[in-house]
Amino acid sequence: MPAIQPPLYPTFLLLILLSLIVTLYVWIISTITYKTVVRHAALYQRSFFRWSFDHSL
């Protein structure tokens, strides 16, 4: 009887696992990106302002 049943539970478990992995991956990438942006925000801002000022003259 269990062999005739469709494998609904493993598919459901795999879907949950996949969604968890994707969520964790997105969270890690966003955290790393946020920390990097915050760390280099002042440097990027200064260099961008200097570049725009030099090219506006």
Curated annotation (Swiss-Prot):
Residues 1-8 are virion surface. The chain crosses the membrane at residues 9-29. Its main location: virion. Residues 30-57 are intravirion. GO terms for cellular component: host cell plasma membrane; membrane; virion membrane. It is a single-pass membrane protein. It comes from the Viruses. It holds the Pfam family SH. GO terms for biological process: symbiont-mediated suppression of host NF-kappaB cascade. It is found in: Virion membrane; Host cell membrane. Keywords: Host cell membrane, Host membrane, Host-virus interaction, Inhibition of host NF-kappa-B by virus, Membrane, Transmembrane, Transmembrane helix, Virion. InterPro entries: SH. Plays a role in the inhibition of the host NF-kappa-B pathway. This inhibition occurs at the receptor level, by preventing the signaling of TNFR1 as well as IL-1R and TLR3. Belongs to the rubulavirus small hydrophobic protein family. Interacts with host TNFRSF1A, RIPK1 and IRAK1; these interactions interfere with host NF-kappa-B activation at the level of receptor complexes. Interacts with host protein UBQLN4. This is Small hydrophobic protein.
